[in-house]
Amino acid sequence: MALRACGLIIFRRCLIPKVDNNAIEFLLLQASDGIHHWTPPKGHVEPGEDDLETALRETQEEAGIEAGQLTIIEGFKRELNYVARNKPKTVIYWLAEVKDYDVEIRLSHEHQAYRWLGLEEACQLAQFKEMKAALQEGHQFLCSIEA
């Protein structure tokens, strides 16, 4: 049976869009262990917890962002399936916008750094193709609902 985890692809809208019109920035966290990969906050589902509760709890634990500081974007949910440490893993992601552009990020011991990045930079740091695809799909979804 696959390990199950859930998380939020957190973004903010730039106050002044950059020249390349990259008005959306994604939050990525750098893991403290292993290959120090960059991902949005995520974690394993606890017994009795539903998937979205897990995503919100993990975001609070890993980045210090509480549920009340976020707006979950309706209509976007992605399931990533891959192998991690020789075991199948499923990760469910939702899109969430921070309500405050300057929200304080407080990292847990599981992460050593964070960055707000435009789509292209975020995809360069996200080493796994499934994660890159989820970021691209999230960006495309956000652009489609703004139009």
UniProtKB/Swiss-Prot annotation:
The modification N-acetylalanine is found at residue 2. InterPro entries: NUDIX_hydrolase-like_dom_sf, NUDIX_hydrolase_CS, NUDIX_hydrolase_dom, Nudix_hydrolase_domain, Tetra_PHTase. Divalent metal ions. Residues 1-139 form the Nudix hydrolase domain. GO terms for cellular component: mitochondrial matrix. GO terms for biological process: AMP biosynthetic process; apoptotic process; ATP biosynthetic process; cellular response to oxidative stress; nucleobase-containing compound metabolic process. Pfam families: NUDIX. One of its GO terms (molecular function) is bis(5'-nucleosyl)-tetraphosphatase (asymmetrical) activity. The keyword Acetylation applies. Keywords: Acetylation, Disease variant, GTP-binding, Hydrolase, Intellectual disability, Neuropathy, Nucleotide-binding. Its EC number is 3.6.1.17. It is linked to Intellectual developmental disorder with or without peripheral neuropathy: An autosomal recessive disorder characterized by global developmental delay appearing in infancy or early childhood, intellectual disability, and progressive sensorimotor neuropathy with associated distal weakness. Affected individuals have hypotonia and delayed walking with an unsteady gait and frequent falls. Additional features may include dysarthria and subtle facial dysmorpism. Catalyzes the asymmetric hydrolysis of diadenosine 5',5'''-P1,P4-tetraphosphate (Ap4A) to yield AMP and ATP. Exhibits decapping activity towards FAD-capped RNAs and dpCoA-capped RNAs in vitro. PANTHER family: BIS(5'-NUCLEOSYL)-TETRAPHOSPHATASE [ASYMMETRICAL], DIADENOSINE 5,5-P1,P4-TETRAPHOSPHATE PYROPHOSPHOHYDROLASE MUTT. This is Bis(5'-nucleosyl)-tetraphosphatase [asymmetrical]. The lineage of its organism: Eukaryota, Metazoa, Chordata, Craniata, Vertebrata. The gene is NUDT2.
